[in-house]
C-alpha cells in the first residue's frame, strides 16, 4: 500500500468482522501505529446498492499521509480524487470544526472481482493520502453546504455535502458509533473524513 503497488490476490472470502480485524492489522503496519483519523466510504445509497450492503464503511487515515495544501504529487495510474468534509469531533462525537478536504484513493485490486465490501474494508478503503483545508467553527448551516473542485479553470465536481451520510452532522454521529463498535481509537479532536461528495474524479497528469 505504501508503495502504491497492486494489492495481493485475496485467497479467501471474509465476512465484515473478519475484514475489519484484518484492516486494523494492515493499517497499523502501514502507518507504524500512527493513525491520523477515521474515514468513511461507500456513503451514498447508490454505491451501497452496488456493493450489496445497507450501510457505509469506515477505515483509518494514515498520519503520515496528510499532505500540505500546496503539495505536488507524482502521477499514479488509477488514483481518484474525492471531495469531502473534514470534521474535528469532541469526546461525544459531535462536530466542533469543519474544513474542506480532498482524499486521494487508489484502488489497486489484483482482480476486479475482489472489489467487494469486504475487500474494500480489508485494504482500508483504498486509502492513500489526503489534504485538509482551513478549519472553521462548526455550524449546522454546513449540513446544506456544497463543495466544488476546479481544475485549470473548469469545474470537475460540484456536489452537496448531504450526499455523504446525509450531511456532516449525521455523518459524525454515525461514524462515532460505528468506529466505537469496530474498535477504532476515539477521543476529543478526532479527525473524520465523511466520504465522497459527487463523483470520484480520475487524477490526470498536469
Q: Where would I find each of the regions flagged by the language model?
A:
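Catalytic-core "active-site belt" of small-molecule-metabolizing enzymes
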Residues: 1-173, 177, 181-182, 202-205
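Conserved metal-binding segment of the jelly-roll/cupin
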Residues: 186-203
Amino acid at each position: 500500500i505504501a508503495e502504491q503497488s497492486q494489492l495481493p490476490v485475496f485467497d479467501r472470502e471474509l465476512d465484515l468482522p473478519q475484514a475489519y480485524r484484518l484492516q486494523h492489522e494492515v493499517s497499523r503496519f502501514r502507518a507504524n501505529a500512527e493513525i491520523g483519523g477515521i474515514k468513511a466510504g461507500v456513503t451514498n445509497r447508490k454505491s451501497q446498492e452496488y456493493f450489496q450492503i445497507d450501510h457505509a464503511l469506515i477505515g483509518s487515515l494514515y498520519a503520515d499521509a496528510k499532505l500540505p495544501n500546496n503539495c505536488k504529487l507524482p502521477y499514479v495510474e488509477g488514483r481518484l480524487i474525492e471531495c469531502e468534509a473534514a470534521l474535528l469531533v469532541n469526546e461525544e462525537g459531535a462536530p466542533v470544526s469543519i474544513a474542506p478536504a480532498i482524499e486521494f484513493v487508489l484502488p489497486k485490486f489484483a482482480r476486479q472481482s475482489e472489489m467487494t465490501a469486504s475487500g474494500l474494508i480489508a485494504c482500508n478503503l483504498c486509502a492513500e493520502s489526503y489534504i485538509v483545508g482551513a478549519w472553521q467553527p462548526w455550524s449546522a448551516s454546513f449540513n446544506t453546504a456544497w463543495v466544488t473542485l476546479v481544475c485549470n479553470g473548469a469545474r470537475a465536481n460540484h456536489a452537496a455535502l448531504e450526499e455523504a451520510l446525509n450531511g456532516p452532522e449525521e455523518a459524525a454521529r454515525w461514524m462515532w458509533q460505528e468506529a466505537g463498535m469496530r474498535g477504532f481509537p476515539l477521543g476529543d479532536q478526532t479527525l473524520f473524513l465523511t466520504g465522497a461528495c459527487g463523483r470520484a474524479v480520475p487524477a490526470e497528469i498536469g
